[in-house]
């Protein structure tokens, strides 16, 4: 028996949000768990995470144990789903599980785009653990990037920012590079005294190198008063501009009024110099562009894409934005306290 209108999944490299909503936009449940990127866990491993969260969501909504179909539409927008073959593999696996009558699978950047605009088209750039960009034209054409990291020319995720900060701190300490406040701020974050001590800790495994991703907010903060940190942030701005510019060019939108939405942990709340640099850089190629952070979470976009498939009207979409936005804010507060 169908129990919900939409099963929506925002599966990222650090966390997964799962929502159940009705066709009228009413939110039945929103739960959060660990990462579910197929790139890191494989398809079965990623869907095992989703399945566990789905059971939790069904219990929260008092909709039973999850046996059989749970929704009309399932929209799974997941990090690490970058090629059609990967989309197909996840879609087939979800269909085999029988969660929904209709299954849509795509990269999580599409969720950011849908969350940020009512137009249904535009460009979105996400910067979380990595960096990615998608574009959708008013005619339905897509512009995408493989987004596999350095092997596909990418730079600008939170990990890249953090690693650049660690490198700059080390070079400041030994004199190969300019002096920077990162020399003190970076090791202090890890409760060590010097960049050399930090390097030894990473080398010996006492400090997990993946934790450098946690330094992204520190880099943005230091950039206000430190030239080296500001240069790292300017590099990020140039990469965001390059991705969005190429997407706009492919879709022939450089002369059109068009929105570029920014999302992901690094860009979600971007303002000040970074936003200004992205805006001014893009306007050189697309003078009518509007650049802004998306106001809604990616899980909202995933759920809205499901409502789109159900042909839900504006009242249902507005209700979804309102209720799921409030539920997400509560989830974030609990996560922060925890």
Ranges and model annotations:
Residues 81-180, 184, 321, 325-338:
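Phosphate-binding/catalytic loop of phosphoryl-transfer enzymes
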